[in-house]
Curated annotation (Swiss-Prot):
Residue sites binding NADPH per the record: 13, 33, 107, 140, 255, 280
Gene from which this protein is expressed: gpsA
InterPro entries in UniProt: 6-PGluconate_DH-like_C_sf (IPR008927), 6PGD_dom2 (IPR013328), G3P_DH_NAD-dep (IPR006168), G3P_DH_NAD-dep_C (IPR006109), G3P_DH_NAD-dep_N (IPR011128), NAD(P)-bd_dom_sf (IPR036291)
Species of the source: Alkalilimnicola ehrlichii (strain ATCC BAA-1101 / DSM 17681 / MLHE-1)
This protein's pathway: Membrane lipid metabolism; glycerophospholipid metabolism
Active site feature: 191
Record-listed E.C. numbers: 1.1.1.94
Protein name: Glycerol-3-phosphate dehydrogenase [NAD(P)+]
Length: 332
C-alpha cells in the first residue's frame, strides 16, 4: 500500500494501531468523532486522553475530516466500539468507492442480530469491498509503548491481508495472515465473555486450578461454535483464539476480567461498569447467547455469564450452576 492507511476511530486501540503502523514506516491518517480531540492530537503529537505516554510517530497524521480521509486512503480500518460499528458503516457507505478495501479491529458481535460483524458489513455495503479483520492478544497501552505483540489479520482477499500485515509489521509488532474471518472474529468476541467468568472465579477466591479449567473449557465452547458456523477449528488454537483468551482472562488490564473480579467480590453490576468504563463483554454476552441458540450450540460458561448479567441469577447461583453440571467426555 503506497497510499496512507485510514484508521477510523481514535480511541486507545485505534491510536495504538496508528502508532504501530507509524513505527513500521507506513503513512497513516487517523480520524475520531471528537474533532477537538483530533485537532489536539495533531498539535500535541499525542493522544492525551487515551494514551498520554505514547507519542505519535511522524508518519501518523490525525485527520479531523472523515470525507477527506476516505478520499485520500484506499484501505480503511474501523476501530470503533461494537455498539457504534453499524452506524459508522452507514456513515461510510456513501463515501466508499470500488477502489476501497475495508478492515476492522473491533471485537464483538452485532447488537441487532447477534451475528458476526462481517454480516453487518455484508448487510450495509453494496457492492461489497474486500474485507479483513485484525485480532489477537493485544492491549492498546502495550502496543502504543512498542512492547512486543503478535496479531492475526484474516481477509477475503490474500492481497489485502498481505498489504494490511505489511502496513503494521515491524520488529515489535508481528502480523500473521489467515483466510478464516469467521474464526478470527469469534475468538475476539467470545473471549470477552469468558474473561468475565474467570474474573468472577478469581474474585471468589477459587484459585488457579479453577481459572485454568474455565479457560480450557471456554476454549472448547468457542471451538464448538466456530465449527457450527463453518470456521476452521485450528484458528482457535492460534493468536486470535487461545492467545487472546489467555491474555484477557489472566491480566487485570482487561476490563472484562476486572468486571468479573468485581462481581465475584459481591459488587453491584451497574456500579462496577460505571467505575470500569465500557466493558464489551456485557453486550457480547447477550449477543452470543442469541448466536449460540440460533446455531444450536451449548455454551454453559457463556450462558451463565449471560444469565448473571441479565439479572436472572446471582453470581453465586451462576457459579453453582456450573459446578453442579455433570461431567462428560473430554472434548477437543
Amino acid at each position: 500500500m503506497n497510499r496512507p492507511l485510514g484508521i477510523i476511530g481514535a480511541g486507545a486501540w485505534g491510536t495504538a494501531l496508528a502508532i504501530a503502523a507509524g513505527h513500521a514506516g507506513h503513512p497513516v491518517r487517523l480520524w475520531g468523532r471528537d474533532t477537538a480531540a483530533v485537532q489536539a492530537m495533531a498539535r500535541d503529537r499525542v493522544n492525551r486522553r487515551n494514551l498520554p505516554d505514547c507519542p505519535l510517530p511522524d508518519p501518523v497524521q490525525p485527520q479531523p475530516d472523515l470525507t477527506a480521509l476516505v478520499a485520500e486512503c484506499d484501505d480503511l480500518l474501523l476501530v470503533v466500539p461494537s455498539r457504534a460499528f453499524e452506524s459508522m458503516l452507514h456513515t461510510l457507505a456513501p463515501l466508499i468507492e470500488r477502489r476501497h478495501r475495508l478492515g476492522w479491529a473491533t471485537k464483538g458481535l452485532d447488537a441487532a442480530s447477534g451475528g458476526l460483524l462481517s454480516q453487518v458489513v455484508q448487510r450495509v455495503l453494496k457492492p461489497l469491498p474486500p474485507l479483513a479483520v485484525l485480532s489477537g492478544p493485544s492491549f492498546a497501552a502495550e502496543v502504543g509503548r512498542g512492547l512486543p505483540t503478535a496479531v492475526t489479520v484474516a481477509a477475503t482477499d490474500q492481497g489485502f491481508a498481505s498489504d494490511l500485515a505489511d502496513a503494521f509489521r515491524y520488529e515489535r509488532f508481528r502480523v500473521y495472515t489467515s483466510t478464516d474471518l469467521v474464526g478470527v472474529q469469534l475468538g475476539g468476541a467470545v473471549k470477552n465473555v469468558l474473561a468475565i467468568a474467570t474474573g468472577v472465579a478469581d474474585g471468589l477466591g477459587f484459585g488457579a486450578n479453577a481459572r485454568a479449567a474455565l479457560i480450557t473449557r471456554g476454549l472448547a465452547e468457542t471451538r464448538r461454535l466456530s465449527e457450527a458456523l463453518g470456521a476452521d477449528p485450528d484458528t482457535l488454537t492460534g493468536l486470535a483464539g487461545m492467545g487472546d483468551l489467555i491474555l484477557t482472562c489472566t491480566d487485570d488490564q482487561s476490563r472484562n476480567r476486572r468486571l468479573g473480579l468485581a462481581l465475584g467480590r459481591g459488587e453491584d453490576l451497574d456500579e462496577a461498569v460505571e467505575a470500569i468504563g465500557t466493558v464489551e463483554g456485557v453486550r457480547t454476552a447477550d449477543e452470543l447467547h442469541r448466536l449460540a441458540t440460533q446455531a444450536g450450540v451449548e455454551m454453559p460458561i457463556c450462558e451463565q455469564v449471560h444469565l448473571r448479567l441479565a439479572g436472572r441469577v446471582s453470581t453465586r447461583e451462576a457459579v453453582e450452576n456450573l459446578l453442579l453440571r455433570p461431567g462428560g467426555r473430554q472434548e477437543q
